[in-house]
Structures are given as structure tokens and as C-alpha cells.
Curated annotation (Swiss-Prot):
<dbReference type="InterPro" id="IPR046347">
    <property type="entry name" value="bZIP_sf"/>
</dbReference>
<keyword id="KW-0804">Transcription</keyword>
<feature type="region of interest" description="Disordered">
    <location>
        <begin position="342"/>
        <end position="489"/>
    </location>
</feature>
<feature type="compositionally biased region" description="Polar residues">
    <location>
        <begin position="107"/>
        <end position="132"/>
    </location>
</feature>
<comment type="similarity">
    <text>Belongs to the bZIP family.</text>
</comment>
<keyword id="KW-0678">Repressor</keyword>
<keyword id="KW-0805">Transcription regulation</keyword>
<dbReference type="GO" id="GO:0006357">
    <property type="term" value="P:regulation of transcription by RNA polymerase II"/>
</dbReference>
<dbReference type="GO" id="GO:0000978">
    <property type="term" value="F:RNA polymerase II cis-regulatory region sequence-specific DNA binding"/>
</dbReference>
<dbReference type="GO" id="GO:0071280">
    <property type="term" value="P:cellular response to copper ion"/>
</dbReference>
<feature type="compositionally biased region" description="Low complexity">
    <location>
        <begin position="51"/>
        <end position="62"/>
    </location>
</feature>
<dbReference type="GO" id="GO:0044182">
    <property type="term" value="P:filamentous growth of a population of unicellular organisms"/>
</dbReference>
<dbReference type="GO" id="GO:0000122">
    <property type="term" value="P:negative regulation of transcription by RNA polymerase II"/>
</dbReference>
<dbReference type="GO" id="GO:0005634">
    <property type="term" value="C:nucleus"/>
</dbReference>
<dbReference type="InterPro" id="IPR051027">
    <property type="entry name" value="bZIP_transcription_factors"/>
</dbReference>
<feature type="compositionally biased region" description="Polar residues">
    <location>
        <begin position="184"/>
        <end position="193"/>
    </location>
</feature>
<keyword id="KW-0597">Phosphoprotein</keyword>
Amino acid sequence: MSSDHKSKFDLELNPFERSFATKESSSVSLNELAAASNNDAISDVNSVATSGSSINNGSSSNKHNLHIPNISSVNQQQGVNGKLPGITPPLFTPGGRRLPPIGLSPGGTTSRQYSNSTNSGSLQSNTDTLGSNIWGGLPTNQTFQPQPQPQPQPQQQQQPQQQQQTQQPHNFNQFMSGMRKTGLTPNESNIRSGLTPGGLTNFGFGSNLVPGLSTPGALLNGPITPGLSSLLGITQTPSSLLVPTTSSFSQNNQSHLIQPAANTSVGPIPESTALGPHVNIPQANQLQQDQSSQALVGGLPPSQPQPQPQPVIAQQIHTIPENQSIAFDMTQPAVANAHLPESKPDLSETANLQRDLNPTADTTTNTTTATKKRKNDTAGGTNKKAKVAKGKKKEPKSKSKGKNNQEDDQNASNKPEDENVPGKENGNEENHKVEAESKEEHLQNGNETTTTKTNNTGNSSNGTTTTTTTKSKSKKNSNVSEDDKRKNFLERNRVAASKCRQRKKLLIQKMEEELEFYSNGYRELSAEVNELRGAILLLKEKHNIQDEIIDGLLSKPTTVPTNVTSIPSTIPTTLNPT
């Protein structure tokens, strides 16, 4: 590989670079391209490559071997000179036609749609040439290689479908690497600014056209990483991302796992389970066991035909070690949930009940009641065992605990006899010991076994009755307390209402007294105001009279005598004799 062998996109000139190019080199390259287009108009890609290599030996600047089909029409429009203008118009590239917008640009379309939309007028495209096959050859699975060396296609002896899947990601990966090396990807404005933002969904290389893109092999070997594929919206198959060791482990252990039998009986299934969502044990199996045991002991027919539950073998359950099961649950929770064995009740109790059957008709009723009460006791003991052994997990409480009973019965059958049990399980162990002793004595005397069972069940029934009485007393106390609370509430309301009425009466009486007081004061004040008003009017009248007198006195003229004689000052005289 030398510097001459470059990608076809490396040496292509954009309109801005074409404006600075010399007219001689551009005219020579255009003429040579026109001659090449006239000679090789209907030739294939190989003939175009050879003609391009011969042109590279000359002094032209067309080193990218791009065969442009519409060069003749451009030369005819340019005239006899064969010279390009200084700056090309925005609608035309140096080749004489607008490049199709790449699909990675926003709003871009495929080359086939663009070439179909531009095949009108003087701009005619030849689909057999290289210029259209660069953009249109990728979706149609035509060989496009940015390097002139022929790439060997792997595994041609296999099926054509597999060959197509390996060829298309190879071409697409080389195309993407070429696009990343060069910043010359044209968009709608003919500005080659590198990869513009957009998804692969707009490019036309979706999973329908290129099925190899959805496989992890093409993504890991190519320039696109799985993280980038998740960003670009390429969906991978989840089965390809699984750990091979855990999948093979699940396949090997499928033979050791027991599939659950179809549940044909109708019964309510509680929402709360003993082990969470990993083990799904239907409650109807416990109901089937109860009904079958009653039918075997008391000779009563079952309520409905029920399928025989399958016993669980202890070796099949313990095939998976603890460390492998933990790793298996960590890696594949879905597979672990699907293939965990579902525990089923044993038929040991039913077999023991068949041994304990008494042929005499007198003890059948006693045995039926004894077995019913004993099952209640064992159910209570197993519930305590589940709470002690699994104290770390907080299990939701429910009314029906059939699932817990079934799982604990199976665990008890699988455990050895010498295993240490907490203090809460002592009652359960004593019940089992008494049952074993009663079985041995039953072989000697059948009536004694029934009496021992009735004694044991009598003690348990006494415990249950005491619990029920305490519950009933608590309910009564709660009811009595609620009635007392209601009575106290009503009494408080009554006292508060009476006090409110008394305060209201006092306020009304006070308001009446104040009203009377203020009304009397108003009347007295109004009378005094009237008296003062009369006095004021009298004073006004007197004042008016005085004013009139003063005005009258002042209005009289002064008369002076004309014959005035000199009078001595010591003698008083009247000046104005009347």
C-alpha cells in the first residue's frame, strides 16, 4: 500500500476547493473525463477502474477514479472553451450534477430515490457507471471497495444466504471506515463537513437490507461498537449476549429437572409464596392430598377425579451445587426462574395411613378425626419450621399456607434424622415420635393406637381451642371497647352542647340588659339636647336684639351747634344738651 492507493473520497474536490483550482488542470481533467465517459458509457466497474488508472498516470488532477456520467452535458453547456466559471452555482458540483445526500445526514434519502428524482431534463444518470454505483451499490449488495485491491470474500463454499450476510457487513464496515477517515461526506448543502448527526435507520442499511448488522460479530469486528449500536438504535438479539457457560449448564441440567404436572383441579391460588417468584407451587396439590388421604382412611370417595401427583426423588433435586446455583442465578435469572424444580408432596403420609387402617368398623370414624387433627398439628409445626429456618426472608402472611406446608414436608423428608432442630420444633418432633411408636403398637393392638392418637390430637385440640377462645375474648374486648368509646364520645358531645346552650342564654340576657341601658341613656340625652337647643335659640334672639340696638345707636347722626362760646375749662358743661 503506497500513498497513491487512497480512497476514492480522499482526493475529491468540493466546490470551495474547485474555485481555487487552476483553469488548465480543471479543463484538462474535465476533457479527459468526457473522453472516458464517451468511450466507457456502458462498461462495468472493472473497465472504469482500468481507465481511471490510465488517467492517473497523466498530469490530470482526477486521481479519485470517479466516473461522472453527466460530464458531456456540462461540456456542452460550457461552450467551446471548456472552462468552468469562477465559482460553481450551488446546484451543481464539479461533476455537473448534484451529489445525492448521504443517508447519515438529517433528512437525507437513499441514492436510489434521489437518482430517480433527478432523472429528468438534461440531467440524465447512467445507472451502469461507477458514479451511481458508489451510492446505490451498497443497498443492492454490489461490491464497493475503497481500496483498489480486490478483497477475498470469505467462505464461498457455504450457503448463498450466509455469503450475503458476510459480504454486506464487510462492505458497510469499509464504507464507514472510509467515511470516518475523510471529512468529505456531502450533505444537502454540498458542504463536506464529515459525518452529520443522524441514525442508521435513515440511511437505508437497516436490518431488512443488511441482516448481518444485527449480529454481534459484524458489530464487534467493524468500526461500530455495541455501545454505539445501542445509541444508533440497532437492536441485538438477547440470546447472543448470554454467557456460554451458564447456557450450557442450563442445557445439561434440564434433564435433571422435573416439569410440573398440569393442574386440572379448580382452587384459589394464594398470592404469597414461600420462596418468592422462583418456585411456583399450586395449592391444589395440597387439597388433592387431603382429599385422597380422607378417601383412603375413611373409605369416602373423593369429591372429583384427580391426577396422581408424582413423587420427587431427592437425588434429582440435589444435583445442582450451591455455588453453581448461585452463579447461575446471578447470570441468568430468567433461565433460573424457568427451570427451578417445583417441589411436590410425598405420598409417605398416605402410605402410612394405609398401614394404619383398622379393619374393624368401630375405629374408622376415630381414625378419620384423628388424621384430620394430626394434619392440622403437622401443618402448624411446619409453618413454625419455615419461619425459623427462613428468618432472614420476611414472608408475607396469608390465610392459606398450603405451599409452605408442601415445601417443608419435602425438606423434612430429604433431611437426615440426626439434624439439629431449634427449640420451636420440639413439639413437631414429639408428634413424629409418638406417631412412630403408635405405628409399632398398632401391629400388636389396633385399638391402643387409636387411643394414643386421640390423646395427642386431644391435647392439640385443647391448644387450638384455647387460642380460639383468646381470639374471641380479644374480639369481645375490642367490641366492648368500641362501644365504650362510642358512649363516651356521645356523652362528651351532650355535655358540650348543654354548655353551649347555657352560654348562649347568658349572652342573650346580657345583650338585652345592655340594650335597655343604652336605650334609656339615649332618651335622656335626647331630652337634654332639646333643652339646650331651646336655650341656644333664646340666646340667639337676645343677641339679635342687642345687635339691632347697637346698629340703631350707631346709625343716628351727630349734631354740632354752630354758636359755640368759649367756656372756661373748670366748669363742666353738657356738650349736647337735649
